[in-house]
Amino acid sequence: GDSYRQFLDNGKTERECVIQSVEAAKKANYVDLKDLIKSNTPIKAGDKIYYTHMDKSIALFNIGTDDLDLGMNILGAHIDSPRIDVKQNPQYEDSNLVFWDTHYYGGIKKYHWVAMPLAIHGVVVKTDGTRININIGDTESDPVFCITDLLPHLGQEQMQKNATKVIEGEALDLLIGSRPVKDEEKEGVTKFINNLLEKEYGFVERDLLSAELEIVPAEIGRAHV
């Protein structure tokens, strides 16, 4: 129902799913294993414990009364996030348009991702070690991104291709912007984007080398009738 759609809307990446899972675990009285270790608190029967690894996976434990040598019951689930990943050093300008170079993850249908609103989620770690959480494109006041496609009257040859070839992986670069710095003749759009990133989001282009950014749909879940 509504709570499931809310989880999907707020959990478009592994990190975001883990954040929500930790919040739910705490509400259910689970405690962080790392905190128990720091405080030298012994684990006892009845304890409810969670552990996260690199902020991208989570394990929850209900401690029983039997010895662990007798085994344990395991219930596993997979956090799957269909997405397109931003490469390191991704930014380039072509024909007065700025793009970010990408590579796609796993089993996506590439033609699903063109000419639709997209958002950028992830983490940027600056050269001084500062960590910035990024979520651009999900709110109405945010800029919107897209992967370009051919117009219908220019795509007749394209439409004859097999579905796996209609959109090639190399064509999945993200359009970031087209507005140049005024009176700049060379890479004016790049300069505008760089100024915007620093002013609005607190990082510069070189910080993308140590970033983990993912392209996800900029839409919310809706109920089917």
Question: Where do the model's predicted regions map?
Answer:
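N-terminal hydrophobic/helix-forming segments and targeting peptides
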Residues: 1-222
